[in-house]
Structure formats: structure tokens, C-alpha cells
Swiss-Prot record:
Belongs to the SIS family. GmhA subfamily. This is Phosphoheptose isomerase. It catalyses: 2 D-sedoheptulose 7-phosphate = D-glycero-alpha-D-manno-heptose 7-phosphate + D-glycero-beta-D-manno-heptose 7-phosphate. Keywords: Carbohydrate metabolism, Cytoplasm, Isomerase, Metal-binding, Zinc.
Amino acid sequence: MYQELIRNELTEAASVLQAFLADEQNLKDIEAAAKLLADSFKQEGKVLSCGNGGSHCDAMHFAEELTGRYRENRPGYAGIAISDPSHLSCVSNDFGYDYVFSRYVEAVGRRGDVLLGISTSGNSGNILKAIEAAHAKGMKVIALTGKDGGKMAGLADVEIRVPHFGYADRIQEVHIKVIHILIQLVEKEMAK
């Protein structure tokens, strides 16, 4: 009854991934982002990650893979998802939701740290403010975006963009693949 829908969904997902894979610059950007992360960890830096909705979950997943493990046992790496409910509710109430990530970056970000900002549209106001705060602190910025990169286009040290203009879930599906590859590459870089 739903097999055609299922096939169409999987076909579209494969098509979006294939289009992303066909652009060699995406592979170079993933490698550059992984090296940027590993360089920070080698200097005892940390990565702060943030996103909204499903991208928030991806930011948490990324941090968890760093502090925990991916495929193999190894030392934990300093990854913090900006996701503490008391912080989010305090800043939302006192300053507004656009500041939930930037206030955290201002509080704990340091020169040599990295911000990973995830936004499928590239237009999330709170991610844009977090990027601004990260730059002010001397941090490096990696952005996972979609569509045309939105307002985040050109603001990061490394932007990894999924140029899909349909629903956000297709962009998120590629983002999670990128996150897993970043972890794998960081592990290889740290083992050198």
C-alpha cells in the first residue's frame, strides 16, 4: 500500500546524497573541517555545537560522539552541545531566543576553540549570533547548512552546504552523515 511512497522517499534521499557527493568541494570542506577540529583538540581546545530542532539533536549527537566514542575506543574529546535546559530557558526569558547560543559562547568559548553551527536554512538568528560571538572570541567556525547557505553563507571558516531546496529532513540526513565522517577523520588525525 505504501511501497511506492517508501521507494520514492528512499530514492529522493539517495539523489540528494549523490548530488552532494558529486561536488568535490564538499569532500575538501569535510576534510578541512576535520583538520580544524583536530588542530583545536591537539591544542587542548574544545568544540561547542548548536542547532535548532532536528539540528539541535544533531549538535548533541556530534558532541556525544566526541566525548563518548564513535566506532573504536579512544580518549574522549572536548565536545559540548549548547543544550542545557536551564541555560536555554534563562537566556530565552531574559534576553530572547536569538541569544541562547551566543551567550554560552561568550561565557565559555576561548581562542582556539571551534563552534559547529548547524542550520538547514542558514538563516537561524541564534546561530548567526553564535557565529558572531565565536569570531569575537577568536574561535574558528564550521557551519553545516543547506539550500543556498542563507545568511550564514561566507561567515564560517569552513561551510559544508547541502544544496537541496526541498524539505529540511533531506538536508539533515546528509548532515548526520557528515557528522559521522568528521568524527572518523578527527579520530584518524588525533591518532597521528
